C-alpha cells in the first residue's frame, strides 16, 4: 500500500531528492531481506548504511555547503517512511541519523568544519535525554554522563549528547554537547524485544572538555539564534525543533504500519484457515473489513503527519512565521499518527493467525518494532494533547516540545 498523496517536485532540489527516493525504492527488497540480519547483528548491516550513503539519503537534510540538498523535509520523511516499510530498525536509524545533519547545520560553523571538513559523509548519533551534564569551565564545558539509547551509534563517529549546563552548582541552560568518538566509549547493552537492529547502545563520557562552539542551546534553536543559521539560510533550518524531532520518531513507525499492512495482505491472500474448514482467508468478509479499517487509519496517520510538516515548510519558504496553532496541531497529529499506526498494526497482527508468530514472519517484527518505538518520549500522547488543548483555551503550553 502506498500513501494517497504523491510527492510534488517544486524545484531542482526536490527533483534531486526525488532521485534519492527512487534509489531508496531500488534498495527496499534488499533491506527487507536483511531485516532478520539486522536483528541478529543488533545493528543495521554495514552494507545498508553504505547503500543509503550511495543513493544520497543522508544528503537530504544536509546543508548545500557540504554537498547536501537541504530539501523539503517532507521528502526526507517520505524516504524514512519507505525504509520503515521494509525494515523497522532501518527506518528508525535512518530517520535519526539522517535528521542529525539538520541538527548539526544549526551549530556554529567551526563545529561543522570539525565534523565535516575532511569528510562530509561523517555521521552523528545522539541521546538527547539528560543523562549527564556539562559544568562550565574556561572556554567551554566539562562533560560527564552515561547516555542510553543512542540509536545507530555504531555507525557514527560523533555524538549529540543532551543535558544541562551547570554553573555554580545550578543549571543555567540546556542543550546538546557535540563530542567525537575518540572521547567517549560505547557500552554494548542493546538486548531488547523490539527495534533490535537499531544498536541503541549507551554512550559513556567522563570529564571530557567540550569547547563552547560545540554546544547548542535548545533555546537558541527555538528562538532562531543558533549560530549555524548565519551560514545555513535555507528555509528547512528554520523548522521548529518541536516538529522536526517528534516527526523523526513517528515517521518510521507509520512506515512500519505500511510494511505490516503489505505483509498482512500478502499473507492473507495465500492463507487457508484450517479452523474454518479450509476457508481461504481472502474469502472471509470480516478479513476485508479489518484491512479496510487499517488502510484508512494508516493513510490518515501519514496524511496528517506529513501534511503539517508541509504546511509549516510552505510558510517558511514564503518568508512567513509558523503560527503556534499550527505547531500545536503538528504535535497533536504526530502522536495521533503513532497511535493510529500501532492500533492498525495490532488489528492486522491479531487477524494474521498463528503463523504470524514465526520468527521469519514480517508482521510480528513490525508489531514488535512499532511497540518498541511507541515508548519514546516524543510519543507520549497526553503531553502533546495538553499542548493543543491548553492553546484552544488560551492557556500556556506547559511543554517545550512544540
Region locations from a protein language model:
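Basic/polar N-terminal segments that are highly enriched at the extreme N-terminus
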Residues: 1-26, 398-402
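Glycine-rich phosphate/cofactor-binding loops in nucleotide/flavin-utilizing enzymes
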Residues: 352-402
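C-terminal helix-coil-helix/basic helical segment that borders enzyme active sites and/or dimer interfaces
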Residues: 32, 36-39, 299-336, 346-357
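Glycine-rich beta->alpha junctions and the first turn(s) of the following alpha-helix
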Residues: 200-298
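Buried hydrophobic positions in well-ordered alpha/beta secondary-structure cores of metabolic enzymes
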Residues: 79, 143-145, 205, 257, ...
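Generic structural signal for well-ordered, non-transmembrane alpha-helical segments
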Residues: 255, 292, 296-299, 331, ...
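Glycine-rich flavin
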Residues: 44-54, 58-156, 170-172
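DPxDG-like acidic metal-binding loop motif
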Residues: 146-184, 188-189
Amino acid at each position: 500500500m502506498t500513501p494517497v498523496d504523491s510527492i510534488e517536485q517544486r524545484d531542482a532540489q526536490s527533483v534531486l531528492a526525488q532521485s534519492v527516493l527512487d534509489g531508496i525504492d531500488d534498495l527496499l527488497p534488499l533491506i527487507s531481506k536483511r531485516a532478520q540480519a539486522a536483528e541478529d547483528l543488533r545493528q543495521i548491516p554495514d552494507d545498508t548504511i553504505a547503500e543509503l550513503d550511495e543513493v544520497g539519503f543522508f544528503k537530504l537534510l544536509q546543508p548545500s555547503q557540504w554537498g547536501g540538498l537541504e530539501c523539503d523535509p517532507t521528502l526526507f520523511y517520505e524516504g524514512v517512511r519507505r525504509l520503515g516499510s521494509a525494515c523497522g530498525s532501518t527506518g528508525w536509524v535512518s530517520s535519526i541519523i539522517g535528521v542529525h545533519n539538520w541538527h548539526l547545520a544549526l551549530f556554529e560553523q567551526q563545529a561543522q568544519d570539525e565534523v565535516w571538513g575532511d569528510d562530509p559523509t561523517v555521521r552523528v548519533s545522539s541521546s538527547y535525554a539528560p543523562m549527564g551534564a556539562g559544568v562550565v569551565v574556561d572556554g567551554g564545558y566539562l562533560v560527564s554522563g552515561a547516555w542510553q539509547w543512542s540509536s545507530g551509534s555504531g555507525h557514527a563517529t560523533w555524538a549529540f549528547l543532551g543535558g544541562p549546563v551547570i554553573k555554580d552548582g545550578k543549571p543555567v541552560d540546556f542543550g546538546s554537547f557535540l563530542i567525537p568518538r575518540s572521547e567517549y566509549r560505547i557500552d554494548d547493552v542493546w538486548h531488547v524485544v523490539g527495534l533490535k537492529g537499531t544498536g541503541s547502545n549507551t554512550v559513556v563520557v567522563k570529564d571530557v572538555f567540550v569547547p563552547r562552539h560545540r554546544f547548542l542551546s535548545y533555546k537558541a534553536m527555538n528562538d532562531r539564534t543558533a549560530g549555524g543559521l548565519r551560514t545555513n539560510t535555507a528555509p528547512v533550518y528554520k523548522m521548529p525543533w518541536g516538529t522536526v524531532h517528534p516527526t523523526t520518531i513517528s515517521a518510521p513507525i507509520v512506515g512500519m504500519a505500511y510494511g505490516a499492512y503489505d505483509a498482512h495482505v500478502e499473507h492473507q491472500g495465500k492463507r487457508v484457515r484450517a479452523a474454518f474448514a479450509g476457508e481461504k482467508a481472502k474469502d472471509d468478509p470480516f478479513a476485508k473489513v479489518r484491512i479496510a479499517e487499517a488502510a484508512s487509519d494508516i493513510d490518515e496517520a501519514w496524511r496528517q503527519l506529513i501534511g503539517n510538516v508541509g504546511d509549516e515548510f510552505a510558510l517558511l519558504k514564503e518568508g512567513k512565521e509558523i503560527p503556534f496553532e499550527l505547531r500545536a496541531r503538528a504535535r497533536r497529529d504526530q502522536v495521533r499518527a503513532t497511535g493510529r499506526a500501532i492500533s492498525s498494526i495490532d488489528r492486522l497482527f491479531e487477524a494474521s493467525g498463528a503463523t504470524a508468530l514465526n520468527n521469519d514472519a514480517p508482521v510480528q517484527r513490525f508489531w514488535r518494532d512499532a511497540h518498541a518505538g511507541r515508548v519514546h518520549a516524543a510519543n507520549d500522547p497526553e503531553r502533546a494533547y495538553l499542548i493543543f488543548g491548553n492553546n484552544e483555551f488560551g492557556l500556556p503550553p506547559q511543554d517545550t516540545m512544540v
